[in-house]
Amino acid sequence: MSGGDGRGHNSGAHNTGGNINGGPTGLGGNGGASDGSGWSSENNPWGGGSGSGVHWGGGSGHGNGGGNSNSGGGSNSSVAAPMAFGFPALAAPGAGTLGISVSGEALSAAIADIFAALKGPFKFSAWGIALYGILPSEIAKDDPNMMSKIVTSLPAETVTNVQVSTLPLDQATVSVTKRVTDVVKDTRQHIAVVAGVPMSVPVVNAKPTRTPGVFHASFPGVPSLTVSTVKGLPVSTTLPRGITEDKGRTAVPAGFTFGGGSHEAVIRFPKESGQKPVYVSVTDVLTPAQVKQRQDEEKRLQQEWNDAHPVEVAERNYEQARAELNQANKDVARNQERQAKAVQVYNSRKSELDAANKTLADAKAEIKQFERFAREPMAAGHRMWQMAGLKAQRAQTDVNNKKAAFDAAAKEKSDADVALSSALERRKQKENKEKDAKAKLDKESKRNKPGKATGKGKPVNNKWLNNAGKDLGSPVPDRIANKLRDKEFKSFDDFRKKFWEEVSKDPELSKQFSRNNNDRMKVGKAPKTRTQDVSGKRTSFELHHEKPISQNGGVYDMDNISVVTPKRHIDIHRGK
């Protein structure tokens, strides 16, 4: 198949990060507090109460929070021990202002390692590492409207290369290299660190209150924020109820809807406060229904992008297969080392057991040698018989110990043999997967390689594209095929451009299109389809290979190419 005019990983995506420029798709956006998706802050009213070191006004709570404190500015805040940078804290609904405590502590080693793993470079747009999973039923079991917020803070210097404190006072945004946002995968909402695409977040100034060390701030999606700068108190790394640590933290594509429930800003403080700028991310906890909605949207956008970018999908699958093969090779090497060590220990324990058995056999032979003196306690040989018996007892104990050690070594050798066999089998599977992925990539990449147009096309009438939205679409007109046949093209994109240019030059075909579409075709762009035929951002007619290139279908064979609408193109590749 072949996509429309979109290029790059983000051509089929949309922006979901309210008021965050360069959101999930890297395209930029300026949505408000509500993005119309049902995932925005309007579904989770601001309120009071308390949580784990983060509070919405007064009250006392559980976890790391608790207590009341009134700021001179008239808002309530908690000056409890703050959560460590990079660790999530809960903020429960309540009286209208969100309170957080921040410190000057450095990143923990675990969070620093996550940042190091996201240095890139990354292919295929944004990548992320999920840190924590969210269990909404544990956070608000009875009333979904009482869902808490999840607040994560980081030193601003860890997410941006810009010296925030030196920016002009009217600077509205700052470019960041990493963000903490929500992602949805495996039917759960997660908190993740995301990197890999140009992004920017608002910069806001913290305003002092009458209480020393307490400031006010606000940013899109977070209308009222009280920030307590805590010094001299230990930070907490205990996860709040309803938040679990994700295991196997590895970098994966972040998807298209990441950040849909998160609101972020960099807060800078007055110079005299001594507090360095802090990055803050506030995430709305989604209900299970909202998570499913996001998951379905993510799948739809991913499938839409996959359909429009077969080469990139093949490359991504090959990269993944190659990474899996590399890991399989490491597993084999590790298990080979384990087996070699197990064999060495097994042979050593066997030698020790053989020696112990020989010692026991010698002791038994000595007993037999002096056995005739067993009933003659006064004879000199009786003492020799007793000594031989004592030797045999000691030898038997040694044999028992050596046998236990040998049995353990034999079990480890057996387990190591099984583990190595399994690792070798897995590697064989990964080798086959990598081979298949490479073959498919090589075939799909043909569309990026030069080629000569072939094929005769078919006669068409004045309703040429009426069938573009059904079956296999409309054929290449024979008149256009005659113009393009035997011509060399640098790539299939080059062919597509020349195809539409020739259509614009044909008097009978061009009059079937509007003036705007003719203007598009004259410069090699595909004409726009009707509204009911579009799919997301795919709004132009597309060229489809009836026999897929991955199955050796001809890239430039015009008898293998048809014109289809975006909607029909997707349905074809879904087998509909």
UniProtKB/Swiss-Prot annotation:
It holds the Pfam family Col-Pyo_DNase. Keywords: Antibiotic, Antimicrobial, Bacteriocin, Endonuclease, Hydrolase, Metal-binding, Nuclease, Plasmid, Zinc. Its EC number is 3.1.-.-. It comes from the Bacteria. GO terms for cellular component: extrachromosomal circular DNA. It is an enzyme of class 3 (hydrolase). Gene3D superfamilies: Colicin/pyocin, DNase domain (3.90.540.10), Helix Hairpins (1.10.287.620), Single helix bin (1.20.5.740). GO terms for biological process: defense response to bacterium; killing of cells of another organism. One of its GO terms (molecular function) is endonuclease activity. Residues 424-447, 535-548 have a biased composition (Basic and acidic residues). Residues 1-75, 421-478, 506-557 are annotated as: Disordered. Zn(2+) binds at H544, H569, H573. Transmembrane segments: none annotated. Residues 36-45 have a biased composition (Low complexity). Residues 19-35, 46-75 have a biased composition (Gly residues). This plasmid-coded bactericidal protein is an endonuclease active on both single- and double-stranded DNA but with undefined specificity. Colicins are polypeptide toxins produced by and active against E.coli and closely related bacteria. Belongs to the colicin/pyosin nuclease family. This is Colicin-E7.
